[in-house]
């Protein structure tokens, strides 16, 4: 199967539970949602085989691989996850949660969008990009970890205030942007 890849790069995870972890990011092209705050060019990309993806990922020393996008669930299947596991990788995904995922993914970060129906039931962490919306509906999701991330620097104080009022949540900043890395 050919998969449309926007880019593959090595950096530190800058958000959520695994913040600070060295990881290889596989950014897939395309998304089934059109979020106003999204900072990713979704359509650009190169079609790659699993062999090409594994070869690229294997150039870096990290054990952790993060599937991101766009929306990676548009392009992944059990075969790719199995290949990554065979290469000794711990596979994480950052998804909007609208489409089913291979069960063998090691860590699922769901970033649900208000009013959008979820297509997954397993998630290890929930990350909400906060714009002042009611977060109580997200607290019902079956996750162990809950993160609020400011939509922009302009609403960081609003996000901090929300976390202080809702101690189930933790603050997630885009630390990769704060320290000026990818």
UniProtKB/Swiss-Prot annotation:
Pathways involved: Purine metabolism; 7-cyano-7-deazaguanine biosynthesis
GO annotation terms (biological process): queuosine biosynthetic process
Radical SAM core domain mapped to chain residues: 18-182
Top-rank taxon, per record: Bacteria
Cofactor needs: [4Fe-4S] cluster; S-adenosyl-L-methionine; Mg(2+)
Binding site for S-adenosyl-L-methionine: 70, 111-113
Keyword Iron: yes
Gene3D superfamilies: Aldolase class I
Pfam families for this protein: Fer4_12, Radical_SAM
Protein residues bound to substrate: 12-14, 27, 68
Binding site residues for Mg(2+): 40
UniProt-listed Enzyme Commission number(s): 4.3.99.3
Keyword terms of this UniProt record: 4Fe-4S, Iron, Iron-sulfur, Lyase, Magnesium, Metal-binding, Queuosine biosynthesis, S-adenosyl-L-methionine
Residues annotated for [4Fe-4S] cluster binding in this entry: 31, 35, 38
Known catalytic reactions: 6-carboxy-5,6,7,8-tetrahydropterin + H(+) = 7-carboxy-7-deazaguanine + NH4(+)
Subunit-level organization: Homodimer.
Annotated PANTHER family: 7-CARBOXY-7-DEAZAGUANINE SYNTHASE (PTHR42836:SF1)
HAMAP family in the record: QueE
Entry protein name: 7-carboxy-7-deazaguanine synthase
Source species: Bacteroides thetaiotaomicron (strain ATCC 29148 / DSM 2079 / JCM 5827 / CCUG 10774 / NCTC 10582 / VPI-5482 / E50)
Taxonomy of the source species: Bacteria, Pseudomonadati, Bacteroidota, Bacteroidia, Bacteroidales
Gene name, Swiss-Prot/TrEMBL: queE
């Amino acid at each position: 199967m050919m998969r449309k890849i926007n880019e593959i790069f090595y950096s530190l995870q800058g958000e959520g539970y695994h913040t600070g972890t060295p990881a290889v990011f596989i950014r897939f092209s395309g998304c089934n949602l059109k979020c106003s705050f999204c900072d990713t060019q979704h359509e650009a990309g190169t079609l790659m085989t699993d062999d090409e993806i594994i070869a690229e990922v294997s150039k870096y020393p990290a054990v952790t691989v993060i599937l991101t996008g766009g929306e990676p669930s548009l392009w992944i299947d059990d075969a790719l996850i199995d290949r990554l596991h065979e290469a000794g990788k711990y596979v994480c995904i950052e998804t909007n949660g609208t489409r089913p995922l291979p069960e063998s993914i090691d860590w699922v970060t769901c970033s649900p969008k208000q009013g959008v129906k979820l297509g997954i039931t397993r998630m290890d962490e929930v990350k909400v990009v906060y714009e002042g919306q009611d977060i109580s509906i997200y607290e019902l999701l079956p996750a162990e970890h809950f993160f609020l991330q400011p939509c922009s620097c302009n609403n960081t104080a609003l996000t901090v205030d929300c976390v202080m009022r809702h101690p189930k949540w933790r603050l997630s900043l885009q630390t990769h942007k704060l320290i000026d890395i990818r």
